[in-house]
């Protein structure tokens, strides 16, 4: 009887670290699953800029050649300008008329990019050619 009790105690003592390890592994697995689901959700989001970029190109009356990198660079200027001033309409005003609005030039000035204006004008011409 004493031997049986001793075996039972040893078994319980051996199970305690196993239970602790199981809980830790369960926590790690849960964290991995949560992170994986968040990453996949973010990657397939319909608000993904790459998904909307070409549509936006036509929405703002661009009639030239769609160049993803040029469009993204010019759009980034408008995003940065919006982030600087936090005016609700500024992003769309900056992009209007395929980046040919006075707001775009104002954003270049505000972001201290006016010395690169000629380069940006060439980019605008590529996107906005008729």
Swiss-Prot record:
Superkingdom, natural source: Eukaryota
Keyword Plastid: no
Originating species: Schistocerca gregaria
MF terms in GO: neuropeptide hormone activity
Tissue specificity: Brain and corpus cardiacum.
Disulfide bonds: 62-98, 78-94, 81-107
GO cellular component term, pick one: extracellular region
Family indicated by similarity: Belongs to the arthropod CHH/MIH/GIH/VIH hormone family.
Record's function text: Stimulates salt and water reabsorption and inhibits acid secretion in the ileum of S.gregaria.
Modification sites for Leucine amide: 127
UniProt-annotated location(s): Secreted
Keywords per UniProt: Amidation, Cleavage on pair of basic residues, Disulfide bond, Hormone, Neuropeptide, Secreted, Signal
Protein name as catalogued: Ion transport peptide
Gene Ontology BP term (one): neuropeptide signaling pathway
